[in-house]
Amino acid sequence: MASEQDRPDVKRHRARWRTYQGLIDPKRLVFIDETWTKTNMTRLLGWAPKGERLVDKVPHGHWKTATFLAALRNDRIDAPCLYDGPINGERFRAYVEQFLAPSLKPGDVVILDNLGSHKGKAVRQAIRDVGARIVFLPKYSPDLNPIEQVFAKFKTLLRKAGARTYEAVSDASAQILAQYAPDECAAYVTNAGYA
């Protein structure tokens, strides 16, 4: 838990949010975020015979970073996108306009964290233009965004895949996304307090 959650202003905002959570139909919620991936990811844990060290190979000095963006709904992962390189305001705006907005319906509630690139005027407008609302989570509250749970599993499976090129990361990402069942997505949303 972030120590900033103990600040009085953050506590108040989180308490208000907890009340708000119960007022929204989970079927209308769309949680957005991004996470990084690298071509040198490997498993963090594993098994080896007793007395032997577990060894896995990773490239050093020759790896690439990519950014994975997606939306979590109550029954699916929606609008997935993988960018070669880091995210910035322009790329996030392009993601919203090209991937997210076409997947939204009037009445949807898009929930984001407080990253600066999420608050751009063009981003907010693209979401509102389709009749959806945009709501920002309380500061220092990743625990209130269930897509963080999705990303934890996603990265674990990506590490297991051992993808070493951008194309391999892209292919592995598609295979991993196919593994998220509707009831699993609903469980993430419920576990974060929505429902």
Language model features: what each stretch is:
Residues 1-195:
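Short functional hotspots at interaction and active-site rims
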